[in-house]
Regions:
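Glycine-rich, basic loop-to-helix element that forms the pyrophosphate-binding segment
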Residues: 22, 66-83
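Short, acidic, metal-binding catalytic loop of nucleotide-sugar glycosyltransferases
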Residues: 24-33
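Short beta-strand/loop segment that forms part of the nucleotide-sugar
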Residues: 33-42, 65-67
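A conserved acidic beta->alpha catalytic loop
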Residues: 40-51, 92-94
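Short aromatic/hydrophobic "clamp" motif used to bind/position activated sugar donors
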Residues: 88
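Conserved donor NDP-sugar-binding/catalytic core segment of glycosyltransferases
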Residues: 95-125
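A short, conserved alpha-helix in the catalytic core of glycosyltransferases
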Residues: 140, 146-147, 153-179
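Catalytic core of nucleotide-sugar-dependent glycosyltransferases
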Residues: 190-214
Length: 246
């Protein structure tokens, strides 16, 4: 079955194994998106014809564009510009779709996001946080005309897009019950984490100055809590309200 409302945009660069992992998960679905658009940044290990041929039976709607870009958010904008569905689901190579998230999907929605640590173990799930302004972007089904990704933000353009797209916050969106996404938590450098947090603070002051009064201290506190401790909390206290603030 095809859900003609939904387009999937998958971003990849030099990650053939991760891309195949994502495509294999999509191929297992009973309800498929109308199109799967892979935006590749000019990988050395990707041969378009081989991938398309490999998935030609189960994913005939697969299209691949491979050319240099200005990074992940530029690639996401490229994918957005060529989608024909009314809804878009963005996935990175390595993300795994499970269940049947696209079945009867008609409007902007949230998908459950299961975190997987570096050892392949489940370590909690994402929650809408920061007053409804933050959620893993793989867990959001966007309208096709959502706010584009601002390339002036190198790390947090997805957060900026959420701020500008969902004026009432993400908590107003319905949650899909019959499927979701597994997201692998890779190692992020301290420098990148700090820079991304600075971008989030900048965006809050610019677009949500009232929220910034309350959220900037939370973001700073998160920087001070070691990642290992946050993972421990996610893994061992799933129902605890603290999860919503890390």
């Amino acid at each position: 079955m095809i859900n003609n409302n939904i387009s999937v945009v998958t971003i990849t660069l030099d990650d053939l194994q991760g891309l195949c992992k994502t495509l294999n998960s999509l191929a297992e679905l009973d309800t498929l998106p109308r199109e799967i658009i892979v935006i590749d940044g000019g990988s050395n290990d990707l041969i378009n014809g081989d991938i398309i041929e490999r998935f030609s039976t189960k994913l005939p709607q697969l299209r691949i564009t491979s050319e240099p870009d200005k990074g992940i958010y530029d690639a996401m904008n490229k994918g957005r510009s060529v989608c024909s569905g009314s809804l878009i689901h963005y996935l990175n190579s390595g993300d795994v779709v499970f269940g049947e998230p696209y079945c009867q999907l008609k409007v902007e929605s949230l998908l459950p996001v299961q975190f997987i640590d570096e050892n392949g173990n489940k370590c909690g799930s994402d929650k809408v946080k920061l007053f409804g302004t933050a959620y893993n972007h793989q867990g959001i089904i966007f309208n096709y005309d959502h706010f584009p990704y601002d390339l002036n933000y190198k790390i947090s353009a997805d957060y900026v897009s959420i701020l500008n797209t969902f004026s009432n916050g993400l908590k107003a969106l319905p949650v899909v019950k019959n499927g979701g996404v597994e997201y692998s938590l890779g190692g992020v450098s301290t420098k990148k984490t700090i820079y991304g947090s600075i971008e989030m603070i900048r965006a809050l002051i610019l677009y949500r100055p009232f929220y910034a009064i309350f959220l900037v201290p939370v973001i700073i506190l998160k920087l001070l809590v070691p990642r290992r401790l946050r993972r421990y909390i996610l893994r061992n206290f799933k129902g605890n309200i603290l999860i919503k603030n890390i």
